[in-house]
Regions:
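Generic secondary-structure boundary signal with a strong preference for alpha-helix termini
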Residues: 20, 49, 133-134
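Unchanged
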Residues: 37-66, 70-126
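Class I (Rossmann-like) S-adenosyl-L-methionine-dependent methyltransferase catalytic domain
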Residues: 1-4, 13, 74, 112, ...
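Catalytic cores of nucleic-acid ligases and guanylyltransferases
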Residues: 139
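N-terminal strand-loop-strand
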Residues: 1-34
Length: 139
């Protein structure tokens, strides 16, 4: 079965004492996701993650904290394996204007302890598994 490589990010910011996570959803779709997408030829993993975050969330003022890990799953059509490399980014940017003109993405910030249902279960697991690491950034 073919495999593709994707990259994305967990983007966090703090407002007062609450830590928020950026999630996106496409118009007409009920569930939120972390911004992510395919690696393009010639890009580093981090460059691809930053590009996808800007395209889907409109966030570009990003400080890399580190790599969170790789999640592997079947794609939506269950015909291809996808390995997604996730990075943790810190931002002070609140508003974003997604740059992907082919899709209608909406950015929303959610408190880390009040996340909505996330379409891809491994993304929700990734956030929960790294919760303490994320919170330590702001101590």
């Amino acid at each position: 079965m073919p495999e593709s490589i994707s990259c994305g990010g967990v983007i966090v910011r703090q407002q007062q004492s609450t830590v928020y996570v950026a999630l996106v959803k496409e118009g007409g779709v009920a569930d939120y996701i972390l911004p992510k997408g395919r690696l393009k030829s010639g890009e580093s993993l981090e460059e691809a993650a930053r590009r996808e975050i800007e395209e889907e969330a409109g966030l570009f003022e990003l400080t890399l904290v580190g790599k969170l890990g790789v999640c592997k799953r079947l794609n939506y059509t269950r015909k291809r394996w996808v390995s997604t490399h996730y990075f943790l980014f810190l931002t002070r940017q609140v508003n974003g204007m997604p740059t992907d003109k082919k899709h209608d993405y909406e950015l929303r910030w959610f408190a880390i302890d009040k996340l909505p249902g996330i379409f891809w279960p491994e993304q929700e697991d990734l956030i929960h598994a790294n919760r303490e690491r994320i919170l330590r950034i702001f101590q």
